[in-house]
């Protein structure tokens, strides 16, 4: 992280086939072929990042790393961060604790085998954590995770033991030594652009890049002008953002950020390590008194 006050973390989920196999249960080569575009989109994005001389974070499922090893090595060789993104894009909420532990281990083994990296960061497939996720991430030595939305432009400490029901007041769990790099659906390209048919209906996608660019630029401008410091985490997928008209939008967004004197780009890891200095796990400032005690 540089000395600039406002940072943008460009993050890319290199899902490959895994999202269509693990999350969407692909039964046809046509659906699966969407993931085959991921390496093409990723190579294009890498060229954009290289030309702009900016770092990024790539969250990679183990399945995708083994399917497309040269691309994952290109992330590493380009000086970018590689994060953990499950094994085959499975939702942790649907797993037992032991199954989730196995998924974390299998993903780590794949990333080590392909690129020789041990990620410090994790992003849950589908942005959905189980009651066991935070404890397991601590067990495996992760420094941060990036799947929750309890803030917008400020990291915060993850917790263990939050409790809620319709009949009782919310109870805050124990803050632990795991940092959350918050995300947001309006800063994710998937719901904006991807067409998806499910048994529950359609995700229409297909929005004009100009509309999404307007949202992202406005979010950045609010951070820069009104808050004055912090981080904006943008989530993209090479198989989506790597399409020509959207890649032009990404280039325009990068130019917009770069035109501001106090702004720069960061990896999630770099921002988290800087943010941690002088801080220790704590609850949100506005948390009530109903709290879990040891």
Roles of regions detected by a PLM:
Residues 2-3, 51-52, 206-294:
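C-terminal domain-boundary segment and adjacent tail
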Residues 66, 79-138:
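Long, hydrophobic, well-ordered secondary-structure blocks that form the structural core
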Residues 112-113, 117-228, 284:
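Active-site-adjacent pocket scaffolds in enzyme catalytic domains
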Residues 2-81, 256:
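Active-site beta->alpha N-cap acidic-glycine motif
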Residues 13, 49, 82-85, 122, ...:
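Conserved, mostly hydrophobic/aromatic
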Residues 42-46, 69-73, 101-108, 134, ...:
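Generic structural signal for well-ordered alpha-helices
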Residues 34-39, 57-69, 90-100, 123-132, ...:
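Acidic-and-aromatic substrate-binding clefts and catalytic sites of carbohydrate-active enzymes
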Residues 4-8, 52-56, 78-81, 115-120, ...:
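Short, well-ordered coil/turn segments that N-cap beta-strands
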């Amino acid at each position: 992280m540089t000395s600039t006050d406002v940072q943008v973390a460009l993050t890319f989920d290199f899902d490959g086939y895994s999202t269509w196999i693990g999350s969407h249960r692909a039964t046809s080569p046509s659906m699966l072929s969407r993931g085959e575009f991921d390496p093409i989109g990723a190579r294009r994005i890498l060229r954009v990042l290289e030309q702009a001389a900016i770092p990024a974070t790539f969250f990679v499922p183990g399945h995708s790393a083994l399917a497309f090893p040269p691309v994952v090595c290109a992330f590493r060789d380009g000086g970018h961060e590689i994060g953990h993104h499950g094994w085959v894009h499975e939702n942790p909420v649907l797993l037992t604790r032991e199954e989730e532990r196995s998924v974390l281990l299998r993903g780590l083994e794949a990333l080590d085998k392909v690129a020789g990296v041990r990620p410090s960061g994790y992003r849950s497939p589908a942005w959905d954590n189980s009651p066991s996720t935070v404890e397991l991430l601590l067990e495996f030595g992760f420094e941060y995770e990036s799947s929750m939305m309890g803030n917008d432009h400020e990291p915060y400490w993850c917790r263990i033991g939050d409790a809620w029901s319709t009949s009782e007041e919310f109870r805050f769990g124990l803050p632990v030594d795991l940092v959350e790099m918050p995300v947001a659906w309006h800063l994710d390209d998937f719901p904006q652009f991807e067409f998806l048919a499910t048994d529950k209906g359609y995700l229409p996608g297909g929005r004009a890049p100009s509309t999404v660019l307007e949202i992202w630029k406005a979010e950045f401008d609010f951070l820069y002008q009104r808050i004055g410091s912090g981080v904006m985490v943008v989530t993209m997928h090479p198989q989506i953002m790597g399409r020509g008209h959207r890649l032009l939008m990404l280039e325009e967004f990068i130019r917009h950020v770069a035109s501001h004197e106090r702004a720069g780009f960061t990896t999630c890891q770099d921002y988290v390590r800087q943010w941690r200095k002088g801080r220790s796990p704590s609850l949100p400032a506005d948390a009530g008194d109903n709290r879990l005690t040891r």
